[in-house]
Amino acid sequence: MANHHRLLRGGGSPAIIGGRITLTAFASTIALFLFTLSFFFASDSNDSPDLLLPGVEYSNGVGSRRSMLDIKSDPLKPRLIQIRKQADDHRSLALAYASYARKLKLENSKLVRIFADLSRNYTDLINKPTYRALYDSDGASIEESVLRQFEKEVKERIKMTRQVIAEAKESFDNQLKIQKLKDTIFAVNEQLTNAKKQGAFSSLIAAKSIPKGLHCLAMRLMEERIAHPEKYTDEGKDRPRELEDPNLYHYAIFSDNVIAASVVVNSAVKNAKEPWKHVFHVVTDKMNLGAMQVMFKLKEYKGAHVEVKAVEDYTFLNSSYVPVLKQLESANLQKFYFENKLENATKDTTNMKFRNPKYLSILNHLRFYLPEMYPKLHRILFLDDDVVVQKDLTGLWEIDMDGKVNGAVETCFGSFHRYAQYMNFSHPLIKEKFNPKACAWAYGMNFFDLDAWRREKCTEEYHYWQNLNENRALWKLGTLPPGLITFYSTTKPLDKSWHVLGLGYNPSISMDEIRNAAVVHFNGNMKPWLDIAMNQFRPLWTKHVDYDLEFVQACNFGL
């Protein structure tokens, strides 16, 4: 009881104390709420009118009683915001381009100043008191005339900015740079293509031309032949039996180039271990026969035998038997070969190299008649007149041909020099008979088994396909495509060291590869007797030229 009284005297009953606490908390909550309201009511006049409570009078200068329906946004406000946004965007764009100009360190610093000035103009315009008042207003009293003037000035600056950016855009726009670079590359490629066409045509003209020294040499040799016929004729003499001896090493060289043919013979004899066992069958045309006869009578060849004949001596080679001679009578074919106007030749660059009339020369097609030209021989080595022999070649006669006709070095690598590059595989006959991925081989040094040739009837096969190609539908002329066809399944690949090609067009052939080669071939337009020959390879050929002969010296050949 005493304790109970003490509780009453000390503060009253628990119920009364709890009620006091509840009232105190409620009063605090109301006070906090009123403080929050007073904070919002004291906000700047720029705050949204929607935050003001209706029916309450405030001391912030508004002093009017408004309802939610009474407060409406000015219809010009969105337009003002849009104009301001356009100005801000273009100001930022101008600043960005100014930054790009500085980063790129443009030589023309005027652009930097122009973009910086444009940016300042936008800033000055936006901060102009008259126009800033429009944007800072509560939206109730925007003057349309001032707004129109503001819009006009902004549009004028936007127009000017776009013009400046359009003029300078290519300095910054990557896509424009890429497109401009592509256009430049395309134009340069066009120029390069035209230059290549002109170069190819000029190279073709040079390759077909006869150097003055070579022409002089042929004329002086012919003059010598006419002046002293008894010294150089073989008429009335018995034909040496070595020329038909199958036990000797026989070579076939078909050429109308006196100096080139002599280099082939000189180099082969020089590198032969037993030169007296080697027989060279040189065939030329009637016009160069006298010069060839004199050339090969002027010196001894260490006992080697050299036979010089004209193609006309082989009477079976006539237009009734040889398809090429028959096709030569075609007006269209003559036009294809001999119409060498620059505008026509450069339009058809694919076939330009085939327009050389040498492809019509019967000398170029004699290789398909070897068994008939040399009926008593079993094997023969064919050499082009643009080769140089660097080693003894008798090892070729020791190769087992496995019943094949043609021993040749293959030239394919990757997708290059496949049959598809030499023949028209869209033609059904070609498509049916041959594999487009078959590996091509090279003419220039070919070892032929003449017995196998006769057995396989390769000449008849050549005639069959040559007649079918009268309109050039199967291949674009030349002798390699018909050779690839004729010896399609009868070619034995030889080691590449026997025959290295490309010295007439490829400057990147390694000297090690050349030194290890038995025969090097100057195939291409840059023949070693021409001024356009590659200097790094030319000495391989010139060291076999008979510069000590008076006729060669008289013509200043090679100077």
UniProtKB/Swiss-Prot annotation:
**Associated pathway:** Glycan metabolism; pectin biosynthesis
Example GO biological process: pectin biosynthetic process
Effect of deleting the gene: Embryo lethality. Reduced galacturonic acid and xylose content in cell wall. Altered cell wall porosity. Reduced vascular bundle.
S-S pairs:
none
Q: Which Gene3D superfamilies match?
A: Spore Coat Polysaccharide Biosynthesis Protein SpsA, Chain A
Q: What tissue specificity is annotated for this entry?
A: Expressed in roots, inflorescences, flowers, siliques, leaves and stems. Localized to discrete cells of the vascular tissue and subepidermal layers.
Membrane-spanning parts: 21-41
List locations, semicolon-separated: Golgi apparatus membrane
Q: Which GO MF term does the entry hold, naming one?
A: polygalacturonate 4-alpha-galacturonosyltransferase activity
Q: Give the way it sits in the membrane.
A: Single-pass type II membrane protein
This chain is glycosylated at N121, N318, N344, N424
Which InterPro entries does the record associate with it?
GAUT, Glyco_trans_8, Nucleotide-diphossugar_trans
List all topological domains (Cytoplasmic).
1-20
Query: Looking at the record's lineage, which domain of life comes first?
Result: Eukaryota
Query: Family assignment?
Result: Belongs to the glycosyltransferase 8 family.
Please state what the protein is called.
Answer: Galacturonosyltransferase 8
